[in-house]
């Protein structure tokens, strides 16, 4: 309920970002990474060691993936044909929010027409005709179009021209604070450089100078008239 005699149905909002990746030129590969605790043993005598796993997504059917917050699962898009300053492949990683996927049942019109929302990540070979995650006409097709159909071709996606698709959204349980005008809800993802730069890319960004911030050994400048952070006018 959001008000007297007024209810709001629980529902889902979904978006899909079509990311035609081109990291340092053509020929990109996607790898999936997770954090895994190492079992007790001679190489983990104190039980505090954990490892990162990596596996290549080589074909489209293998690349329809679901996020896992327990293992911090993320995906790296890299150019295996080049090396960075430390000998690795330059790339970016896709960090997603493991939010609920499509909750409608198998066979429902919503699920069959919005099949893209059954996975958090898809990777397909680039095809200029494959523009939309739900197909060209989602309101009228019988179901199965879009990403489920694209991925069913099972094309190779290793070291080639690829598209990374990310489905994300918000599962909304209505509350009184949403009425009569709903406040902002946030949904999104991050693309972060991983081995793409040789150092922190923010080092050459000019810093703002605050005239009131001075070294303690220096005489501070006279405060201007009016209130400041440290003086009352």
Regions found by a protein language model. Name each.
Residues 1-233:
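Extended effector regions of multi-domain proteins
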